[in-house]
């Protein structure tokens, strides 16, 4: 029994700890930021009461809608608003100037509301701002020149507003800007030459304004520009500068309906050009004969005054999908060899719009299903003597017609609590669909042929992992011959509603532009993904500091209180047990009678001799089990000896079972058990020695050498194979429960091996459905930062908990960051970058050269592993398959040869450390491709 005085002490400690929590959190937030948010709310009209929870508490700890915070404990100990996410909340009113007081804000997103008034110039004070997303509102006035002060701004979207005035010269100071979207406003004046000084600018999208003057030839100096889109402006009388043929990285050049005159310059030197739209201008002369880029997919030159014939070089453009020359003054014959050339792939979609041009046609006009040909207005369409014209008259000589959609033949008005959706002719479903509004790649495919529609359905559903009957094309709208606007509806399979994880997965696919790669239908622009009806509250659950973070804070406090309680109790009982306990650790276990096959039993003396009496100079680590020593056996074999501490000692039976299990686990990517010792009350495990330490040390900023992307990919694959073995081939299956970079060790050849697994993590029997072990209820164990949130909250452990932890490991390999980084979590950092299309910015610059596509694939795989819901994470078998694909074209480093032979042959007992192979060999040519080196955030 605990004496009363100790009881009082325990209660006092716990009460003080718990009652201090609200006080602490009340003062960790800067009050002027709270006042700024309340002023923002006061200036907004919120008919749906989405911001009703902004009335009490503080933004970070009370889950204010749209507020995401991060800590700055390393700096000032406060929480700060990092993101203000108010997209599509049906808000009106004005954006208050107090928004400029949120000095730590990185993302300001008020897209697709009905906000009016001027854009606050005070936003220019937020030096940390990276994303400024104001598009889809009714802002008026001019663009504040103060926005040019935002040196860290990555993306500026002010499109779809009522902005007037000119583009400020100060925008030339946005040294970090990559995306400048000012389209669909009433901006006037000339394009400032200063915009040619933006070194990172990728997209300059200024279409649908009232811009005038000439096209600045200096824009061709932009080193990173991939899209220049200036359609529907008033550059009346201006010509296309010859310098535009020297863009270094341009992919899309779109100058539709700009009043341009003169001839088309030579664009053949733009190596990556794939999309060219110069239609609806006053261009004259002939089409240049020089061959355009092999990447060319779209050539739109319709409605000009071009003469001459179609260049023969067009027949060599094997990637061409659209050639539109409608309404010019071209002469000669219809060059049927363009679509009849055998170099074209049979499944490539191709559209040739040659209306109102030619005087004659030669060759066979029969076209395969994947080719659409328009010849209306040509003399050939008046002929009655040429076969095949009659057979395909609707497509060749008729008017272009829009494909019928589901909305043309609506479902009957049957009673349905949600919506009757027509999924195929004659079939309507009562369901709660997901509605998507987005624009397709401009401007080719507003007129769907049946073949193109089939391909489109396959493209969408395969990218979303749905079946084709789950997609309904609701409407297709022509926006002034601009980009076709598509309204889609997705219906659940076999149910009325999608479950939460499916909704989040599908929405993330659209919002992160992560569809299967295609140049035909993409890239696209997401306009709306409304979550209505049964899905209305899904996003509200993710506002503020994530619930899991708050729960971990509270749980940590409770654990701390428990520890204090136990400590106080132990202080009391320790004295009473001190004398009787002196022999506990050194009591002699009775001899283990059963021999364990495959491992050696060592005496205490042997292991003591191997470590010079467990001298501190041989200590190489410490874990939950105890200290780890490097030892050298009598036969010169180097080993790692894990010496259990008193609190880790098990019963004889438990220890024997542990050894029996570990002795049966054999895989090249698991650290091998060599033997054990149970002499004089000690319990020790003897493992193979890993001379290159753990992965965490290699990723450390203080590491003398580092791992290339090739090495990291193979480390990831190797460790994944080890974990897969534990999950599916070990008998019984084993759930690791503490996967982290410090538990992935590297041998002398830098091959990855998973360590620190054992009996305490045995998985239950396999489930009936998915071939994986079912869950087991257990006390939560693991390392903060790697801990599966579902496991933390429910205490139900599954193999998908290991998948989550491994996803964090992948993110560490990719970025070099620790899981908790400057008050935020690595998952959040990479997910944000991935959604913004800037995942390369968080990649570890020390990896050297590597393929951007491989980096993106690794990031997407890691984020998939880190999904909140276990059922949405991939099994380890899928993870291994994906990593094999990434590693397939990434050659295993050549340094695994002569240098590692030297390292692996080292057996000198006097050597306490082994030189890194990276210090002996250069690692600059291990991978193909590259990305610009950016230091990890």
Curated annotation (Swiss-Prot):
Ranges in the topological domain labelled Cytoplasmic: 569-937
The keyword ATP-binding belongs to this UniProt entry's keyword annotation: yes
SUPFAM superfamilies linked: L domain-like (SSF52058), Protein kinase-like (PK-like) (SSF56112)
Keyword Cytoplasm: no
Topological domain ranges for the Extracellular compartment: 21-547
Ranges occupied by LRR repeats: 102-126, 127-150, 152-173, 174-198, 200-222, 223-249, 251-270, 271-294, 296-316, 317-341, 343-360
Signal peptide: 1-20
Residues given in the record as ATP binding sites: 620-628, 642
Keywords: ATP-binding, Cell membrane, Glycoprotein, Kinase, Leucine-rich repeat, Membrane, Nucleotide-binding, Receptor, Repeat, Serine/threonine-protein kinase, Signal, Transferase, Transmembrane, Transmembrane helix
Compartment(s) where it occurs, according to its Swiss-Prot or TrEMBL record: Cell membrane
Cellular component annotations (GO), alphabetically ordered: plasma membrane
Membrane topology reported for the UniProt record: Single-pass membrane protein
Protein name from the UniProt record: Putative leucine-rich repeat receptor-like serine/threonine-protein kinase At3g53590
Annotated catalysed reactions: L-seryl-[protein] + ATP = O-phospho-L-seryl-[protein] + ADP + H(+); L-threonyl-[protein] + ATP = O-phospho-L-threonyl-[protein] + ADP + H(+)
EC number of this enzyme: 2.7.11.1
Active site as annotated: 738 (proton acceptor)
InterPro entries: Kinase-like_dom_sf, Leu-rich_rpt, Leu-rich_rpt_typical-subtyp, LRR_dom_sf, LRR_N_plant-typ, Prot_kinase_dom, Protein_kinase_ATP_BS, Ser-Thr/Tyr_kinase_cat_dom
MF terms (GO), sorted A to Z: ATP binding; protein serine kinase activity; protein serine/threonine kinase activity
Source organism (scientific name): Arabidopsis thaliana (Mouse-ear cress)
Transmembrane segments: 548-568
Domain Protein kinase: 614-886
Glycosylation sites: 50, 63, 90, 114, 162, 184, 210, 272, 295, 327, 357, 370, 413, 499, 516
Family per record: Belongs to the protein kinase superfamily. Ser/Thr protein kinase family.
